[in-house]
């Protein structure tokens, strides 16, 4: 419920700040005896999730994605959601054995582990909390027929924090 209420509260504000479409609620429903959770009606965005395209096709949206992050990564407003995982500096996250398992068996496993450990050594972001999407992976990036970034969806993890965390999902 908290993820949805974060979207309901903050997307009307963030929609005016970014250069692409976001699922700003058209209607917000309250929990009831029929359905015990908050709910929203949001617009449908035609296009294709970047995750459904090959890497070369995804590359066409990079300029739009950069513009989106420039628009989004500004000082967060007071009361912005806090998230115990998203928005934290990458080097402050618990190193998870799942990373070692994920790269095990790859020819480049040693290089990936070395790179991960180097990233963890980067100094923390200290320029103040900015808006962070929190889950900006290719499945949440909608590209139009031209391959341009048209919409960014799934804002349940929106938070204030380190902008680099948006590049880690």
Give names to the regions the model predicted:
Residues 11, 26-28, 116-120, 138:
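A generic local structural motif
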Residues 43-47, 97, 156, 166-168:
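Short glycine/proline- and charge-enriched loop/turn segments
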Residues 1, 59-62, 89-92, 106-114, ...:
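Short, structured helix-loop boundary elements
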Residues 129-132, 137-169:
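Active-site Asp-x-Gly
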Residues 1-89, 126:
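ATP-binding pocket architecture of kinase catalytic cores
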Residues 40, 67-70, 83-124, 147:
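Active-site catalytic-loop/activation-segment of kinase and kinase-like phosphoryl-transfer enzymes
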């Amino acid at each position: 419920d908290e993820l949805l209420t974060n979207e309901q509260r903050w997307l009307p504000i963030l929609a005016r700040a970014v250069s692409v479409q976001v699922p700003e609620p058209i209607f917000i429903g309250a929990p009831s005896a029929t359905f015990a959770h908050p709910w929203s009606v949001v617009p449908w965005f035609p296009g294709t999730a970047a995750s459904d395209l090959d890497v070369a096709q995804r590359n066409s949206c990079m300029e739009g994605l950069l513009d989106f992050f420039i628009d989004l990564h500004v000082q967060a407003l007071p009361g912005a959601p806090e998230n115990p995982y998203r928005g934290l500096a990458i080097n402050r996250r618990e190193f998870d054995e799942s990373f070692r398992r994920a790269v095990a068996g790859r020819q480049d496993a040693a290089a990936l582990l070395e790179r991960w450990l180097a990233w963890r050594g980067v100094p923390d972001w200290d320029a103040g909390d900015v808006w962070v999407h929190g889950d900006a992976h290719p499945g949440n990036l909608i590209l139009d027929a031209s391959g341009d970034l048209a919409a960014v969806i799934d804002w349940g993890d929106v938070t204030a924090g380190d902008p680099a965390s948006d590049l880690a999902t």
